Amino acid sequence: YNIVDQIFIGQGVGYLGNAATNVAYPFSTICLAIALLVGIGSASRVSLCLGRKEPKAAAKAAGNGIVLMGIFGIIYLLVGETFLPLLLKAFGATTDVFPYAKQYARITLIGMPFLIVTNGMSNLIRADGKPKYSMVCMVVGAIINTILDPIFIFVCDWGIAGGGLATVIGQIFSFILALRYLWRFQTIHFEKESFLFDIKESLKICSMGISSSSNQIAVTVIQIIQYNSLTYYGALTKY
């Protein structure tokens, strides 16, 4: 999503638009860290339970994982929208870039819960033996974003807001495809009880996904340091 947005926003808005999407990008990488935490954690739990011939426990692990994705997604959206100005400045937004970054991030944050569920579900779908369907979920959203970006940015003349809106719509389509798979699982058979929140199961899920999530968080920290370094040292030269 970010690469496509960079291309079209750069053409339609200019260098400030490109800078804004870069400054807002840590929101996406943090989002992916959350998705990895729950997605890989729940997929690992499902695989272990199925290996022990415990289908109900596997369904419970998957169900709790999906519930956690939704909870974390909503919390992340609320926190991001509430502290957006402070976070953008922490990410390295300058005075010139800030209005563009705020406009773009305000819209793309709406899609973060959908992105968390989609990326988290893709791990469960792969664990169910359907990697192609998982790939389709991701590719469809990217294609829709690529189609809508030039329409919203150039035809509708919505600028950077159009790029953000195209991203969110693409993420919603991916989310719908991922959610449809709930009724297509082959190794897991869900019941209502599968989606009852269980704190112990949730902790087990997070403990198994924390390693991959930590790696993604480290990438995010490096990005933020780089952006702030560019903001500071870039201002010291006329080039």
Regions found by a protein language model. Name each.
Residues 7, 11, 44, 85-86, ...:
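Transmembrane alpha-helix boundary and packing residues in multipass membrane permease domains
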Residues 46-111, 155-210:
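Short alpha-helical transmembrane segments in multi-pass integral membrane proteins
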